[in-house]
């Protein structure tokens, strides 16, 4: 879900081409995996699976999107969530219940023969489990792509790496990265391209938001942006009913944040959430190293255990090999 500040971002988004995106991209791994699991499905909403019934949509997404990244001069690093803060538990429970309702709605739509509704509800029912994480990391290792284990929120770690200059930008569909202080956020990187939605095909392009320009345009500081986020709602609190981005911006600019919270939610203490956004748990215990893919290892995993087409897997990996030979291996990996 992320923080609900879309309505004050309209003039701050820059549509990009792939040529604008070369560099090191720190991806919110859980966010990317949810995108893969939601989108990579059959027309009736059924996820891709192997013969044993193991879901493989996320592995397909990692393989083909990563190859696409490398072809375009983007070196990805996947940042995985660690332990969530205690005040996120309510949101986690709500999301679990939402996925369960969506799963039931998917089954109902299938029985009624409504394939469009079935696909929609199936996408909303996507879930990540321990096998999803373990298999994703295994594939990344075989592809030679680094991944980082965050102590807590992956977006916070990615934003920290961007602030330290270790990566070029953070990648997520959510806007939390801005509250966590990422200098640059890129959206739609894992979902860009032509997609079918509501019976029609649309083109989704990557977009970039530069934090300093965003703050200047709004006339606020990052701490004030966090206050805006708290007012409209984040992953850690529901926000104040009826308060959208524009109203929250006015409240914060007028110095009324504390008084509005005291009036509307007298039992709510925003300080722990504010402090978490401004000083989240992060780590320097990681290494960013891109290696040439272990082609036979990838084939053994995806084709031998997950029933992927060997021809498609080898063809995808060959694109990376061809790209690497056009540069030097050292320059690429």
UniProtKB/Swiss-Prot annotation:
Region annotated N-domain, chain positions: 1-99
Q: Does the keyword Zinc-finger apply?
A: no
Q: Does the keyword Acyltransferase apply?
A: no
> What residues does Mg(2+) 2 bind to?
174, 176, 235
Q: Which domain of life is it from?
A: Archaea
Q: Give the required cofactors.
A: Mg(2+)
Please share the entry's free-text remark on the cofactor: Binds 2 magnesium ions per subunit. They probably participate in the reaction catalyzed by the enzyme. May bind an additional third magnesium ion after substrate binding.
Described purpose of this protein according to its UniProt entry: Structure-specific nuclease with 5'-flap endonuclease and 5'-3' exonuclease activities involved in DNA replication and repair. During DNA replication, cleaves the 5'-overhanging flap structure that is generated by displacement synthesis when DNA polymerase encounters the 5'-end of a downstream Okazaki fragment. Binds the unpaired 3'-DNA end and kinks the DNA to facilitate 5' cleavage specificity. Cleaves one nucleotide into the double-stranded DNA from the junction in flap DNA, leaving a nick for ligation. Also involved in the base excision repair (BER) pathway.
Family, per entry = Belongs to the XPG/RAD2 endonuclease family. FEN1 subfamily.
Q: What is this protein called?
A: Flap endonuclease 1
Q: Which organism is it from?
A: Methanoculleus marisnigri (strain ATCC 35101 / DSM 1498 / JR1)
Provide the gene name from the record.
fen
């Amino acid at each position: 879900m992320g923080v609900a500040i879309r309505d004050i971002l309209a003039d701050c988004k820059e549509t990009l081409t792939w040529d604008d995106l070369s560099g090191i991209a720190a991806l919110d791994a859980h966010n990317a995996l949810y995108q893969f699991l939601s989108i990579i499905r059959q027309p009736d909403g059924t996820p891709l699976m192997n013969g044993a019934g193991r879901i493989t949509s996320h592995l397909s997404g990692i393989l083909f999107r990563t190859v696409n990244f490398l072809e375009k001069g983007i070196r990805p690093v996947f940042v995985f969530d660690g332990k969530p803060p205690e005040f996120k538990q309510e949101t986690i429970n709500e999301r679990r219940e939402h996925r369960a309702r969506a799963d039931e709605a998917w089954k109902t739509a299938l029985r009624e023969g409504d394939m469009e509704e079935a696909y929609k509800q199936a996408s909303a029912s996507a879930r990540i489990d321990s096998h999803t994480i373990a298999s994703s990391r295994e594939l990344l290792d075989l592809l030679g792509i680094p991944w980082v284990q965050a102590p807590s929120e992956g977006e916070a770690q990615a934003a920290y790496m961007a602030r330290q200059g270790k990566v070029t930008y953070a990648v997520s569909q959510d806007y939390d990265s801005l509250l966590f202080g990422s200098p640059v956020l890129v959206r739609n990187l894992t979902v860009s391209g032509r997609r079918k939605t509501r019976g029609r095909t649309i083109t989704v392009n990557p977009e970039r938001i530069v934090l300093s320009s965003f703050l200047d345009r709004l006339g606020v500081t990052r701490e004030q942006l966090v206050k805006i986020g708290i007012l409209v709602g984040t992953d850690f609190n529901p926000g104040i009913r009826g308060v959208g981005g524009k109203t929250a911006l006015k409240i914060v600019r007028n110095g009324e944040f504390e008084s509005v919270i005291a009036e509307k939610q007298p039992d709510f203490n925003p300080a722990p959430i504010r402090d978490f956004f401004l000083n989240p748990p992060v780590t320097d215990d990681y290494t960013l190293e891109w290696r040439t893919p272990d082609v036979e290892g990838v084939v053994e995993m995806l084709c031998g255990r997950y029933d992927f087409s060997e021809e498609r897997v080898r063809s995808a990996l060959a694109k990376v090999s061809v790209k690497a030979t056009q540069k030097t291996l050292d320059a690429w990996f």
